[in-house]
Amino acid sequence: MNCRSEVLEVSVEGRQVEEAVLAVLHTILLHRSTGKFHYKKEGTYSIGTVGTQDIDCDFIEFTYVRVSSEELDRALHKAVSEFKDALRNSGSDGIGQVSLEFYQKKKSRWPFSDECIPWEVWTIKVNVVSLANEQERQICREKVGEKLGEKIINIVEVMNRHEYLPKMPTQSEVDNVFDTSLKDVQPYLYKISYQITDSLGTSVTTTMRRLIKDTLAL
């Protein structure tokens, strides 16, 4: 199986890190979740509905849609908060990345553990910029909102390609494909990891600073 890989890059102010990453992760999982499966008998099941809600960001001029699941939201907040703290405490130039990996389990014979086979990985590269004053922060609030909107459109376009998804499992195999631990939604099995890098600034960071400078010059 070939694992698809998608990379998104965002440049934000420190206080925008959490909201920007959550907006991207929630958007991806909105398209990679189903309602709970209700099996009647082997091979026959119904799928519950997935509720959604709009989320307004505090530090970014942006609203996104997420699955209406407090359990899923808590799990994502925990992972992103750990990344944000690690980024802040790293002493580096404020550059890191978060990876969201979707996988399915392949049963192995005893005494070996199950094999986790990734089928899609999303990487969000995050560059933190330092701003001089409140005027620059307000401009960044708007510009980051515009850029996030472009990322969301890109995510939706990728989701609409109808590429590989794990086939719907039988009742006995559902835990090999979906996370069934949540009571109100059923995302594909996933895991989130992060990495802090020591690299110097990227073209995205430079572009954001140029956008702010050009806006101030108007």
UniProtKB/Swiss-Prot annotation:
Residues that span the membrane, as ranges: none
One CC-aspect GO term: phagophore assembly site
Tagged with keyword Cytoplasm: yes
Keywords from the UniProt entry: Autophagy, Cytoplasm
InterPro entries listed in its UniProt record: ATG101 (IPR012445)
Entry annotated with the keyword Cytoplasm: yes
Biological processes annotated in GO: autophagy
UniProt xrefs under Pfam families: ATG101
Intracellular or extracellular location(s): Cytoplasm; Preautophagosomal structure
Superkingdom: Eukaryota
Entry's family note: Belongs to the ATG101 family.
Function noted in UniProt: Autophagy factor required for autophagosome formation.
Protein name, per record: Autophagy-related protein 101
Organism: Xenopus tropicalis (Western clawed frog)
Gene that produces this protein: atg101
